From Swiss-Prot:
Bilayer-crossing regions: none
Role this protein plays: Lacks antimicrobial activity. Does not inhibit the formation of NO by neuronal nitric oxide.
Organism: Litoria rothii (Roth's tree frog)
Biological processes per GO annotation: defense response
Protein's UniProt name: Rothein 3.2
Domain of life: Eukaryota
Places the protein is found: Secreted
Length: 30
């Protein structure tokens, strides 16, 4: 279970990073 949780956490991070980068770009564009 802990291994699966770690993988899920890693997936969440990789999915969130591009989103956060996009938000940063939008804020800089303002």
């Amino acid at each position: 279970d802990s291994a699966a949780g770690a993988v899920r956490a890693g997936d969440d991070e990789t999915l969130l990073k591009p989103v956060l980068n996009s938000l940063d770009n939008l804020v800089s564009g303002l």
